[in-house]
């Protein structure tokens, strides 16, 4: 229920304590009702909150002892579904026992019988140990990966990039670049720059105009070279 919450959250911790404490008393009342019905005992709140009710020399006292021990088993399942952390089970078990001790102290005074203390400590240990075992098994359960497999099998469409049309980025175009360059050598880009002194330079790029990464051959003709070619 609260497994995904790992950060310190006082409201969450208080909610867990109250939930476990309420379930502890609800389950204890239900167990006492069943046992009292079986052994013809009278159900009362004194069985829960008076330390004198737990004793070994009367049938009602033994019924209350049995009810507290059985309730510790059910309390461990409360830890499994509410706490869900094995390292926190002992803390919550001790908290439940301490709160019950405070309530009993307020209702009937400070507990003075060894039997009451023994039953409470044994119940706390049972609740903590079984709760840790159940929570540990839940923590070690395999995570279902069916949804992850479905997501992995979904095809992902990647929009084409403007650079994919480049011959260097595209292996098919790159393999045909050499053959296409021989057929497109007639595409010549010329740029003439006239200087202020009347001399001019002509830059001719010969290559594949469709391949921007093709090596460019430069031919620089000065004004004197052009005059020599004209005389020849």
Swiss-Prot record:
Low complexity composition bias: which ranges? 163-211
Kindly state one GO CC term assigned in the UniProt record. Golgi membrane
Q: Which UniProt keywords apply?
A: Golgi apparatus, Membrane, Protein transport, Transmembrane, Transmembrane helix, Transport
What main location does UniProt list?
Answer: Golgi
Q: Does the keyword Hydrolase apply?
A: no
The Basic and acidic residues compositionally biased stretches are 220-232
Record field: transmembrane: 12-32, 63-83, 90-110, 114-134
Compartments, record wording: Golgi apparatus membrane
- List the InterPro entries hit by this protein, alphabetically: Integral_membrane_SYS1-rel (IPR019185)
Q: Give GO terms for biological process.
A: Golgi to endosome transport; Golgi to plasma membrane protein transport; protein localization to Golgi apparatus
Asked whether the UniProt record includes Membrane among its keywords, one would answer: yes
Q: Which family does it belong to?
A: Belongs to the SYS1 family.
Q: What does this protein do?
A: Involved in protein trafficking.
Q: What is this protein called?
A: Protein SYS1 homolog
Q: Which organism is it from?
A: Dictyostelium discoideum (Social amoeba)
Q: Which gene encodes it?
A: sys1
């Amino acid at each position: 229920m609260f497994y995904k919450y790992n950060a310190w959250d006082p409201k969450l911790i208080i909610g867990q304590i109250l939930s476990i404490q309420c379930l502890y008393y609800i389950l204890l009342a239900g167990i006492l009702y069943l046992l009292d019905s079986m052994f013809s005992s009278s159900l009362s709140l004194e069985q829960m909150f008076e330390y004198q009710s737990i004793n070994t020399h009367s049938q009602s006292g033994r019924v209350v002892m049995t009810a507290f021990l059985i309730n510790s088993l059910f309390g461990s399942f409360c830890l499994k579904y509410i706490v869900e952390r094995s390292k926190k089970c002992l803390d919550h078990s001790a908290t439940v026992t301490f709160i019950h001790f405070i309530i009993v102290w307020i209702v009937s005074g400070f507990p003075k019988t060894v039997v009451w203390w023994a039953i409470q400590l044994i119940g706390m240990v049972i609740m903590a140990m079984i709760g840790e075992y159940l929570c540990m098994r839940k923590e070690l359960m395999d995570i279902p990966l069916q949804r992850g497999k479905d997501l992995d099998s979904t095809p992902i469409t990647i929009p084409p990039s403007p650079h994919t049309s480049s011959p260097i980025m595209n292996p098919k175009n790159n393999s045909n670049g050499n053959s296409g360059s021989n057929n497109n050598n007639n595409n010549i880009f010329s740029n003439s720059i006239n200087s202020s002194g009347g001399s001019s330079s002509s830059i001719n790029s010969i290559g594949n105009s469709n391949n921007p990464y093709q090596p460019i051959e430069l031919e620089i003709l000065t004004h004197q070279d052009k005059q020599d070619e004209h005389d020849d």
